[in-house]
Amino acid sequence: MLTIPRFVFPVSVMAVVALMLGGCGGDVSHRSQASGPSAAAEATHEVERLGVEVVARHSFDATSFTQGLEVTGDKLLVSTGWEGKSRIYHTTVDNVQSNSQDIDRRQFGEGATQVGNVVWELTWRDGVAYKRDAATLAELGTAKYAGEGWGLCSFSDVVVMSDGTDELRFLDPDTFAERSRVKVTLSGTPASELNELDCVTGDNGQRLVYSNVFLSTDIYRIDADSGKVTGIIDASTVPNNAASDPNNVLNGIAHIPGSDRFYVTGKRWPDLYEVRFVKPTS
């Protein structure tokens, strides 16, 4: 079976893939940024629509193929992808980096999250999660999981993982063993391509998961218990100043604790934006 990767092929290769899939009745339209109206345009009135207000812009590492972003104390935890270039590190909002750790050059790094004194870091197709010391990011061990790894976030008692499907997995924070799954739906329809994640506990105690959507500028707000998408943030107004490349898309969302603001960035983006999610003015 032909599978589509976590990055976009050059046009010449995509043409070959399209011909191959066309001959067997396949469809790659779900991977295209021009595949049709955004989820925000198709959602019903039951799903809250929000936009983005940019509060501040900070310098960011334009070489980082960002796969994970999270606020940890006074720093940001960043995990990156691409074979031979995947790493995890801490950085300040002024782009002062520390504790950089590479992974096996044959592996493609994915999302990461800190839970307690431990950081977990995913790989894309190797089924390996790295367990790291939260202070130094030194490797403490590994754990195995089935399928692909895309995004990670955590609450105090559970790690949440996406794998590109319409499911979120709930994992043990100590062993990474799977506890359960929930199907994610948008107005009753399966919502897939869930990518980088951020876990936020709302003012009412509700557990929310914010998810980038692969190759989209939409961000889903998901009720972690029911799996229902309760809000869609249209982040298309956030400036993408990355080099021209179809892979350099929005990816990376991190709530700033004690505030109504988030950090957002993208793959190989030179900027980190501090934003609020707001109701549209019109």
Residue ranges and their predicted role:
Residues C24-V28:
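Bacterial signal peptide processing site
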Residues A41-T63, T92-V96:
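A short helix->beta-strand "capping" segment at the edge of beta-propeller domains
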Residues V55-R87, Q101-T113, W150, G266-P270:
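Beta-strand-rich domains and repeat architectures in extracellular enzymes and scaffolds
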Residues R57-A62, Q101-R105, G141-G147, V182-S192, ...:
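Surface loop/turn motifs at the tips and blade-to-blade linkers of beta-strand repeat domains
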Residues T66, L194-E196, D245-A254:
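Signature of short aromatic-glycine-proline-rich micro-motifs recurring in repeat-based ectodomains
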Residues L76-W82, Q114, V119-D126, M161-T165, ...:
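Conserved beta-strand positions in repeat-built beta-propeller and related beta-rich domains
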Residues T91-V96, D133-L137, D172-F176, D223-K228, ...:
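Short loop/turn segments that connect beta-strands within beta-propeller blades
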Residues N95-G149:
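Blade-loop segments of beta-propeller domains
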